């Protein structure tokens, strides 16, 4: 099953547009887990088990594992998700971007070592830095387009004088993902929930590609505005929330609290569909 097939199945089965981001910070862990980096897997696995029936995808952020020398725990978590939530696609949030030969190795890391269904990428180095990922049939790749952070406009909001119409950089990336770069229909775009007007513009330029939309919850993005700007019946959106769900409680009931927060967010997203 391809990434897009898996995504469509999860959306239908779970009635959800919600992606839960797995950004483990041991200092924020509850109770007996607090401060213990050796328990990253335990924390994340409980979040996964509590929310698997409510999501369209999971999105582990690789830096939160690598910073604690926990790559082996990430491998263990990926296996746990394949075994216990086999119908839910996993997007490895790595934001890689490098020359072709190095990109080939990063693609192997994402799709073979970790077994991810999709990965996030920076398109700044051009198509030859993206192409190695597209050789992995059935896998997905999300290009950073209009990101949720305030500094994103430093580059993404600048106009390209050398291109007809002088589009903003993020608009150019959207067109590339919809057209010439999307050779096998594997590309998607990352567009922040904090910029609903830009989500709407990206959807106009890229009407069929999936949008990964972070920024709902702790970053302040509005769920209703996000869905209304980006959702179309024939074009998937994946709305990510991380901290607001995984740290919904600092007590021993953290998994139950995460489930409650995920259900509330999922229902709000579904209700916002026009």
From Swiss-Prot:
EC number: 4.1.1.23
Superkingdom of source: Bacteria
Record keyword S-adenosyl-L-methionine present: no
Entry keywords, A to Z: Decarboxylase, Lyase, Pyrimidine biosynthesis
Disulphide linkage map: none
Gene Ontology BP annotations: 'de novo' pyrimidine nucleobase biosynthetic process; 'de novo' UMP biosynthetic process
Protein family: Belongs to the OMP decarboxylase family. Type 2 subfamily.
Name by which UniProt lists this protein: Orotidine 5'-phosphate decarboxylase
């Amino acid at each position: 099953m391809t990434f897009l097939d898996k995504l469509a199945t999860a959306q239908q089965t779970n009635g959800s547009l919600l992606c839960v981001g797995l950004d483990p910070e041991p200092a924020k862990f509850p109770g007996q887990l607090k401060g213990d980096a050796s328990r990253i897997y335990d924390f994340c696995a409980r979040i996964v088990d509590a929310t698997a029936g409510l999501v369209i995808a999971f999105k582990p952020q690789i830096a939160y594992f690598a910073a604690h020398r926990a790559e082996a725990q990430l491998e263990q978590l990926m296996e746990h998700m394949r075994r216990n939530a086999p119908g839910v696609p996993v997007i490895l949030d790595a934001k890689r971007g490098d020359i072709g030969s190095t990109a080939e190795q990063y693609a192997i890391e994402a799709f073979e070592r970790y077994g991810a269904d999709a990965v996030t990428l920076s398109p700044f180095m051009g198509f030859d830095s993206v192409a190695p990922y597209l050789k992995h049939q059935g896998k997905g790749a999300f290009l950073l387009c209009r990101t949720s952070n305030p500094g994103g406009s430093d580059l993404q909001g600048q106009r390209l004088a050398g291109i007809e119409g002088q589009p903003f950089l993020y608009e150019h990336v959207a067109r590339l993902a919809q057209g010439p770069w999307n050779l096998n229909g594997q590309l998607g775009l990352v567009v922040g929930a904090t910029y609903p007007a830009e989500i709407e513009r990206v959807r106009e330029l890229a009407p069929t590609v999936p949008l990964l939309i972070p920024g709902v919850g702790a970053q302040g993005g509005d769920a209703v505005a996000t869905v209304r700007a980006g959702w179309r019946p024939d074009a998937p959106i994946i709305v990510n929330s991380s901290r607001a769900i995984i740290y919904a409680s600092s007590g021993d009931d953290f998994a139950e609290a995460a489930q409650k927060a995920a259900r509330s967010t999922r229902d709000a997203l579904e209700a916002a569909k026009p």
